[in-house]
């Protein structure tokens, strides 16, 4: 007996785009000498006394069992010839924005999940293209031609299946899951591959003798609810390829910010003000991209001793003017008590956001 009726909207056309080893791929693109070599984004343990973790790595490094969140020390032990790169997150964010602009050519219904992946609803796309597969191929082509990177794409009628499909063939793959193929596709998947099913849930499912999508399909809804509560309701539907979650292009952003951590501490006011300027310009650009304005400017300062100060100023009018943001953030810094310790982190954030208003001056 079903607790809730099964409603399966199969009319949508959803694409999930996942960049291939994104950070490492950007570094390889910008330094051809790295091609074909194991590249790890993370601090070199030989320079940090073994401290640090792997942010990500390329496919060559993955052959040695290296993966995200592994300690840099273990990564080095697995592959002493690996090339460690601390990473340039400002550059990665810039590339990520370039990719999102490509998405927007095809649809405004884009839900970024992180800097390197997003869902797109192309049911009613800007170009009137009926085939979601064709759009996915065009996006892959545009990203490769304009950005010099590859991505994997999953196409289906909901986000859950599109996400699984993008993981199915990497790198630079494209997998389509039609409604008539969904049950067969899911039946063969190990339960740990199901997006949204965490490690503890996998262990519990294994204890119940459930190892694949086929196993999960055979379990009554009430049994899953008894074991997992509300999540059991979701599991029952996942096994049947049912997920009506919309692509949320209208996520409410509460703030837009930019911050950087410095390996070399900042002491000189000229250097500090220069970094505040960079962050302010970054925030202004992000406000422009997201068609937002803000009133409250927040400066975050973290010193060498990890003392962290946060101070904000609310303006009388909305703005996204880079010079104004820089001026206010600089004034906030000037108002702080002097601290002889060097600065290890600076951040500028805009809050109290509102959508762009046509009659407000937006000059950057």
Curated annotation (Swiss-Prot):
CDD domains: PolY_Pol_IV_kappa. Keywords: Cytoplasm, DNA damage, DNA repair, DNA replication, DNA-binding, DNA-directed DNA polymerase, Magnesium, Metal-binding, Mutator protein, Nucleotidyltransferase, Transferase. Binds 2 magnesium ions per subunit. One of its GO terms (molecular function) is DNA-directed DNA polymerase activity. It is an enzyme of class 2 (transferase). InterPro entries: DNA/RNA_pol_sf, DNA_pol_Y-fam_lit_finger_sf, DNA_pol_Y-fam_little_finger, DNA_polymerase-Y, DNApol_IV, PolY_HhH_motif, Rev_trsase/Diguanyl_cyclase, UmuC. It comes from Streptococcus pyogenes serotype M12 (strain MGAS2096). Poorly processive, error-prone DNA polymerase involved in untargeted mutagenesis. Copies undamaged DNA at stalled replication forks, which arise in vivo from mismatched or misaligned primer ends. These misaligned primers can be extended by PolIV. Exhibits no 3'-5' exonuclease (proofreading) activity. May be involved in translesional synthesis, in conjunction with the beta clamp from PolIII. Its EC number is 2.7.7.7. GO terms for biological process: DNA-templated DNA replication; error-prone translesion synthesis; SOS response. It is found in: Cytoplasm. The keyword Transferase applies. It catalyses: DNA(n) + a 2'-deoxyribonucleoside 5'-triphosphate = DNA(n+1) + diphosphate. NCBIfam families: PRK02406.1 (NF002677). It holds the Pfam family IMS. This is DNA polymerase IV. Its cofactor is Mg(2+). It comes from the Bacteria. The record marks 23 as: Substrate discrimination.
């Amino acid at each position: 007996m079903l607790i809730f009726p099964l409603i399966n909207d199969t009319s949508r056309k959803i694409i999930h785009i996942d960049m291939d080893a994104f950070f490492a791929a950007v570094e390889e693109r910008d330094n051809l000498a790295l091609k074909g070599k194991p590249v790890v984004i993370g601090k070199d343990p030989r320079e940090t006394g073994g401290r640090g973790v792997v942010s990500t790595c390329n496919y060559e490094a993955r052959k040695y069992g290296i993966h995200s969140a592994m300690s840099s020390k273990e990564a080095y032990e697995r592959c002493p010839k690996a090339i460690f790169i601390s990473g340039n997150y400002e550059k990665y964010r810039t590339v990520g924005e370039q990719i999102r602009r490509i998405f927007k050519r095809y649809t405004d219904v884009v839900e970024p999940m992180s800097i390197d992946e997003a869902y797109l609803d192309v049911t009613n796309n800007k170009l009137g293209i009926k085939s979601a597969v064709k759009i996915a191929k065009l996006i892959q082509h545009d990203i490769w031609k304009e950005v010099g990177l590859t991505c994997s794409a999953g196409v289906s009628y909901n986000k859950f299946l599109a996400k699984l499909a993008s993981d199915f063939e990497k790198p630079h793959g494209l997998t389509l899951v039609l409604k008539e193929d969904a049950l067969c596709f899911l039946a063969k998947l190990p339960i740990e591959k199901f997006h949204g099913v965490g490690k503890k849930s996998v262990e519990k499912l294994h204890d119940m003798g459930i190892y694949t999508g086929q196993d999960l399909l055979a379990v009554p809804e009430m049994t899953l609810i008894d074991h997992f509560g509300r999540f059991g309701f979701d599991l029952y539907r996942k096994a049947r390829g049912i997920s009506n979650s919309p692509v949320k292009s209208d996520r409410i952003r509460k703030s837009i910010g930019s911050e950087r951590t410095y390996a070399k501490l900042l002491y000189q006011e000229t250097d500090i003000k220069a970094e505040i300027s960079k962050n302010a310009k970054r925030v202004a650009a992000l406000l422009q991209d997201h068609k937002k304005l803000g009133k409250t400017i927040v400066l975050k300062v973290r010193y060498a001793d990890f003392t962290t100060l946060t101070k904000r100023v609310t303006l009388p009018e909305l703005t996204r003017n880079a010079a104004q943001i820089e001026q206010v953030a600089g004034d906030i810094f000037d108002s702080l008590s002097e601290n002889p310790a060097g600065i290890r982190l600076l951040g500028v954030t805009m809050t109290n956001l509102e959508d762009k208003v046509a009659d407000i001056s937006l000059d950057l």
